[in-house]
Curated annotation (Swiss-Prot):
Entry's Gene Ontology cellular component terms: cytosol; small ribosomal subunit
Similarity-based family: Belongs to the bacterial ribosomal protein bS20 family.
GO molecular function, one term: structural constituent of ribosome
A single BP term in Gene Ontology: translation
HAMAP family registered for this protein in UniProt: Ribosomal_bS20 (MF_00500)
Top-level taxon: Bacteria
Coiled-coil ranges per UniProt: none
Annotated organism of origin: Rhodopseudomonas palustris (strain HaA2)
SUPFAM superfamilies: Ribosomal protein S20 (SSF46992)
Alphabetized UniProt keyword annotations: Ribonucleoprotein, Ribosomal protein, RNA-binding, rRNA-binding
Protein's UniProt name: Small ribosomal subunit protein bS20
Region (Disordered): 1-36
Alphabetized PANTHER family for the sequence: 30S RIBOSOMAL PROTEIN S20, SMALL RIBOSOMAL SUBUNIT PROTEIN BS20C
Role noted for this protein: Binds directly to 16S ribosomal RNA.
Length: 88
């Protein structure tokens, strides 16, 4: 339990930031899931359209330190590679 007023304020602040980050992480995962579902169905056009939404979502999450920038780049790269394989 926080004792000082500054510690209590920090606890409130952390709770607010956690809620915001959780929301952003959920949105990011949803956009990635949409791409993966399109890839699984074999629909290249839908996958490309979903990827156009997922890539900025991943990069924004990395920029805001929700995920590591290398993890976001790796995810984008792997999704793009899987979409490219659909065309072959």
């Amino acid at each position: 339990m926080a004792n000082t007023s500054s510690a209590k304020k920090a606890t409130r602040k952390i709770a607010r930031r956690t809620a915001v980050n959780k929301s952003r992480r959920t949105q990011m995962r949803g956009s990635v899931r949409t791409v993966e579902e399109a890839i699984a169905s074999g629909d290249r056009e839908a996958a490309l359209k979903a990827m156009a939404n997922a890539e900025p979502a991943l990069m924004r999450a990395a920029q805001r330190n929700i995920v590591h920038k290398n993890a976001a780049s790796r995810k984008v790269s792997r999704l793009a590679h899987r979409i490219a394989q659909l065309g072959k």
